[in-house]
């Protein structure tokens, strides 16, 4: 998301979200949902995005989330284009990573990640590159899976090759 128009379509806690670097250099995040009838605004990640257009009725939003045009809505009683905008999510950029909060009342990045930033700082995150995304569907209760992931006592027995590579 380095250049103006770069955008990523993703999900945050099950909510479709578009991250977009505006022509003004500001990185913004919006739900990928039109305010009119909830049609999608972006269909894929990419480069060179200009304005965001709803794929259902053609409502057009600027890169800052303001509604610019709503076809055939000129005569709608009480409707004003200037009253409509996409709800902006709070975004924080750190070391090439992007953090977005759906809840406008969520604590600030600095509060949530207090202490972690200092521990990670020696790692040159800025030089790292995204390689791939893996997804595994596991037929189990998520709490059991997370507990297993966080608990390292089983590593020597179940993953003996990792014992030499990881300080569990």
Q: Where do the model's predicted regions map?
A:
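Rieske [2Fe-2S] iron-sulfur-binding domain
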Residues: 2-104, 108-118
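C-terminal catalytic domain of Rieske-type non-heme iron oxygenases
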Residues: 92, 97-168
